[in-house]
Amino acid sequence: AAFPRQARLIRPQLRFHRASDLPVLATSHVYSGAISKELDRDMDDIIFADMPWALKTTTPNQGIREDSLKLSIADNSLQRLLALGVDSYNLISVLKVLEEYPYERFQGETGTLHLNAQRQLQRQLSWAQFKGGLPQALQQVNTRDDGEQP
């Protein structure tokens, strides 16, 4: 796990040590949530998981995200907290469905959500990869809890 400043050093160091072909996976900490094309170019090919809200992928609440950007919130972690609030609000109306149908999924701003056997919400993040200094969402593969394809 590395924050953006440290993560920008990983790829150049791997290239220096002739290990640039190694795949690099990271946590969501690697992406600040702000587009920094020039700074993040050194993170090209790093694969990481993050919430759809941070990756700016198309979601049902696109209007809310656009309105939140008008608030000029300087700290991008507050944007992530806002996404959590949006999901909390939207989940209220579908909790019964998630409880009755264990393989039902809710496509939220924070990821794909479902209720497990213990009635706890679990979240699956979206995968992305830096290309040209920009995070690009990767195609998602849906799996069940037991690892089998649905």
Pin down the residues of each PLM region.
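Extracellular/periplasmic periplasmic-binding protein-like sensory domains
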Residues: 11-86
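Residues in flexible loops and secondary-structure boundaries
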Residues: 54-57, 121, 135, 143
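Segments of small-molecule ligand-sensing domains
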Residues: 65-137
